[in-house]
């Protein structure tokens, strides 16, 4: 994430406000999905083994404000995903500034979907994976 710098990327840290109720709602939903994933991981009837890596839940923030991502980040969620480069880039910028204010590590971002050649240079500035 440290590469997310430059004239078009530097932003003032905004106060990404959210209510405790909204944070709890988001975290409950996240935990519910994660519990279902962990329960499904226990089913070894497929190709998964005890040595298989755990499944990583990518929290997609499409159509949701950066403040929701901040609430989840403050609750311990560290992996977010987007399929729109401009929206992802803006949220990544906001969260980098938010994390710098708090002296915490910024989250990892995944770009989801077809990566067009003209967007590749932009996406690699914030995303650590493409799916």
For each of these PLM feature ranges, what is it?
Residues 2-131:
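Conserved alpha/beta-domain cores
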